[in-house]
């Protein structure tokens, strides 16, 4: 539930809140998204007791020895004021609205407005290019980074993923670069 605090309208449903699902659910969360602590590699899991020992063995061998300053920062983030999180989410909302409107103004793009997180996932089938081809072309010719929808599996064909975790100005510039690229081909 790493994006559970970054939503714009309806709060996301936790599977653990569904009657009978708590004992069948593993919740993984961390500090990277909500508290902008990306790369600090600190998170936690909530799970049925019978899984704890096995998960602990896995974690000790894959991600151990979290630095003490990181742990202290996590405590401060959890116990401190949360108004910074709310302000960050509102800024993401502003960027989402403007960026998705910009994408929807591009020929061949259709972008549903995401309800949370900080990604836009437009359908690009109207461009006539595959996800991989447009991903490569935008990076090479327009200087705009995205991710091919096929990075998420075969059903991602026809889509790109863009992050809105950048400045408003850079996002608007990216839309214009994409527009210029589409005009030039």
Give short role names for the model-derived ranges.
Residues 1-185:
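PLP-dependent class I/II
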């Amino acid at each position: 539930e790493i994006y559970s605090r970054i939503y714009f309208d309806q709060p996301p449903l936790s599977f653990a809140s569904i009657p009978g699902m708590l004992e069948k659910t593993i919740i993984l969360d961390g500090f990277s998204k909500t508290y902008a602590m990306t790369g600090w590699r600190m998170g936690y899991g909530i799970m049925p007791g019978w899984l704890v020992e096995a998960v602990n063995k896995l974690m000790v061998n894959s991600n151990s020895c979290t630095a003490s300053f990181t742990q202290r920062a996590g405590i401060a983030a959890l116990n401190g004021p949360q108004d910074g999180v709310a302000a960050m989410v509102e800024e993401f909302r502003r960027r989402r609205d403007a960026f998705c409107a910009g994408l929807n103004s591009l020929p061949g793009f259709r972008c549903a407005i995401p309800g949370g997180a900080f990604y836009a996932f437009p359908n690009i089938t109207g461009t006539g290019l595959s996800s991989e081809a447009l991903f490569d072309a935008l990076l090479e010719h327009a200087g705009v980074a995205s991710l091919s929808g096929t990075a998420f599996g075969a059903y991602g064909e026809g889509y790109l993923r863009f992050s809105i975790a950048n400045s408003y100005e850079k996002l608007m510039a990216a839309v214009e670069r994409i527009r210029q690229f589409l005009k030039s081909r």
